[in-house]
Amino acid sequence: VNPTSRQRFLDTLQFKPVAKPWARWGAFLWDETAERWKQEGWDGTPLDDYFELDRLVRVDPWYGPVPEFEHEVIAEDEETVTYVNHEGIVMREFKKNRDTSMPQFVKFPVANEAEFEKFAAERLALHADRRLSAAWRSMVASGRVQAAVGKGELRAEEQAAARGAAPGEQWPRKCWADRWGGFFGSLRNMLGVENLCVAFYDQPRLIERMMEERADRLIEITAEVLQHTRFEVFWFWEDMAYKGGPLVGPALFRKFAFRHYERVCGWLRHQGIQHIGLDSDGDIRTLIPLWLEAGIDHLWPFEVQSGMDVVAVRKEYGHRLGIVGGIDKRVLSGGGEAMRKEVDRVMPLVEQGGYIPELDHSVPPDVSWKNFCDYIAYLKFRLNRG
């Protein structure tokens, strides 16, 4: 009997040999990329079905503000619009090319302890019936949840996409506390990045309280998820680095965050969740020891343009760290020999185990449908999955 996708996924993270390497098409597309590909020949079939690859099914509810903030336009001119988003942040955005330009963050919902306690009481309580909505429950019960589950109700086309082909296959499942499951990223959503970085020095009590609240909620919300479904892997979300390194020094971050990571990881393991991952963009090298020690065993996406090199990271950490990602998305715009060399570069890690080869984040719109198909074909060829 051939092992299921779920079993191959677990074997991979446990550095056990797998006859058929576990691989998915990637994680995300920019909206403009999807539009471009549809013009160039993609019929919209979910990519894991189209390319006959594995999938990591998401079963997470929304870990952020409930009720969500109402979308409220505060000001607009010919080129920009200023509004309150679903997380309570006042944003100013270009009307055109929203996805390809950075918004301006005008104001954040929290500035001090009193505002945080009010925000937490009004927006961050469990509200199990709203977080784990009827739509979420029925999707999970049918084993079909896959698209971005978190926010609100699933759209019809996402439900269709989540059904997928290969009806007998058992996919691995992931509960990803996206945007609100961590001890830097979620605080940044409330305070803003500059205010947060300064608060580590000026408002340590506020930081301590916010981290404690997040750890409490991560455990409380995830306990509810486990009433409805099992999953193989839990992911934190941090996005706390750029190409120059982390946005807060590793020693300072450890002082505040370590015990909260350790507590959540300990609780997860006690529930039988064997694998705990974390998503952070940027150059996270100096944070890896802290995360490993706290109980996190794999990371994503290892952005090449930020100096992350999965070959070097593997040399340093060996079997202690599972790696997901690390293929430079930038080589796909040109494709050809540069793309093949980049895929070749990471293949030794596939042999060693504990590695899932995929792009180091969302596929940008400068990648043609043909180049993406070429990339997947070559990846499958190198993995003997052609």
Q: What is each stretch, according to the model?
A:
Residues V1-T33, T82-V84, A111-G386:
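Active-site loop segments of alpha/beta catalytic cores
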Residues N2, E40, I74-E76:
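Generic structural signal for well-ordered secondary structure
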Residues P17, E52-L56, A75-D77, H86:
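Short, solvent-exposed loop/edge-beta patches enriched in aromatic
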Residues V18, D43, R58, W62-G64, ...:
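Compositionally biased, intrinsically disordered/low-complexity regions enriched for serine, proline
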Residues G26-F28, P61-W62, V84-H86, K96:
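Acidic/polar N-terminal loop/beta-strand segments that form early-domain functional surfaces
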Residues W30-H71:
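Segments that shape or occlude catalytic/ligand-binding pockets
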Residues V73-A125:
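A contiguous, low-structure linker/loop signature
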